[in-house]
Amino acid sequence: MAEQASSFTDRLAARFAGAQIAVALPRGEVTLEVAAADWHATCLALRDELGFEQLSDLCGVDYLGYGSGEWDTADVSSQGFSRGVEGKAVGRFAWGEFPSQESSAGAQPQQLPKQRFAVVAQLISYQHNQRLRVRCYAPDEQVPLVASVTDIWPGVNWFEREAFDLFGIVFDGHPDLRRILTDYGFVGHPFRKDFPLIGNVEVRYDEERKRVVYEPVTSVEPRVGVPRVIRDDARYETAAGEVGRSETAK
């Protein structure tokens, strides 16, 4: 598997100069990371030149708060979860609030990552018996914009609509970019890490108006139900050691 993956990454490196290529061993999972400006051209080349005729999945990813936890499990804790955990991760707050982090100058707003929103596609080549993960980061966190690939793989239509609905990622050139899971009056994008877990509106039936109404959330108090834990122990040594190769193609 490692030999096959190495040969495949050599082909990718020769074709896509400047792209980031990583291989996870021993499974041989290959990830190709390209700039958002090259997203459409890369996908087209992968289909027409490298035989990736099927896109099996496409999703959005929000890296806000990536790598930060709420409960330290590296040693014996004097503050077990049964004793309460202070919410530090994103999403633990009411609408409009934002998490903070401690620094020498006191509590400061949590820093936004330079590359927050990503689009990830899973491709399959039946003729070469090969799978490939392709990823790009939207250059603008305020308005994450990535080219649509519906003209390359028409089946991606609803996947892109889902990523738009849940993450707010805009796919330029999509023929029908509208919400697909939430209703048309929904405020915000619920899979963003800064979207409050309690939501921002609640729905009830109003007897006087004889219709469903949306109102600001007032009946739910934000709290940590399950702490965000990032474990660093033997169970994750294999996963951490699987990245066998990460290089910049030249």
Curated annotation (Swiss-Prot):
It is a peripheral membrane protein. It holds the Pfam family Complex1_30kDa. The keyword Coiled coil does not apply. Its EC number is 7.1.1.-. NDH-1 is composed of 14 different subunits. Subunits NuoB, C, D, E, F, and G constitute the peripheral sector of the complex. It comes from Xanthomonas oryzae pv. oryzae (strain KACC10331 / KXO85). Its main location: membrane. GO terms for cellular component: plasma membrane. NDH-1 shuttles electrons from NADH, via FMN and iron-sulfur (Fe-S) centers, to quinones in the respiratory chain. The immediate electron acceptor for the enzyme in this species is believed to be ubiquinone. Couples the redox reaction to proton translocation (for every two electrons transferred, four hydrogen ions are translocated across the cytoplasmic membrane), and thus conserves the redox energy in a proton gradient. Belongs to the complex I 30 kDa subunit family. SUPFAM superfamilies: Nqo5-like. PROSITE patterns: COMPLEX1_30K. This is NADH-quinone oxidoreductase subunit C. It catalyses: a quinone + NADH + 5 H(+)(in) = a quinol + NAD(+) + 4 H(+)(out).
